[in-house]
Amino acid sequence: MASRKEALARRANRVRRHLKSVANGRPRLSVHRSSKNIYAQVIDDVAGKTLASASTLEKDLRGSLKTGADTAAATVVGKLLAERASKAGVTEVVFDRGAFIYHGRIKALAEAAREGGLTF
C-alpha cells in the first residue's frame, strides 16, 4: 500500500500529465497550499520560466491579511496574480491544482484569477 506522500505525488503527476496534453503552449497556473499560506505562479513550461507569482508571504499582503490560510487570503492572491500575469502579457493559462482538490482555498484562488482576467 502506498504512503500518503506517494499517493499525493502520484495524483499530482496524473493531473500534470493531463495538463500537458491539453495545454497547447499555454502557460500553467500552478498552485501550492500549505497549512498557513497559499502560493501561485504562472509558469511557461516551454521556456522554463516563471512569468508571474504571488503568495501570502509577501510583505504588502502579510500586513493586510488576518491569516494566510483562509479563502479571503486566497482570493487576494488570485487577484494579485491575475494582475501581474496581465502585465506580463498572459491572458490564457491551464490550471494546475496539483494533488489538491478543487475546493475551498484552491477554488477561491481560481475564481479570483478568473475575475482578474485570466481564462482557463
Swiss-Prot record:
CDD domains: Ribosomal_L18_L5e. GO terms for biological process: translation. It comes from the Bacteria. It holds the Pfam family Ribosomal_L18p. InterPro entries: Ribosomal_uL18_bac-type, Ribosomal_uL18_bac/euk. One of its GO terms (cellular component) is cytosolic large ribosomal subunit. Belongs to the universal ribosomal protein uL18 family. Part of the 50S ribosomal subunit; part of the 5S rRNA/L5/L18/L25 subcomplex. Contacts the 5S and 23S rRNAs. NCBIfam families: L18_bact. This is Large ribosomal subunit protein uL18. The lineage of its organism: Bacteria, Pseudomonadati, Pseudomonadota, Alphaproteobacteria, Hyphomicrobiales.
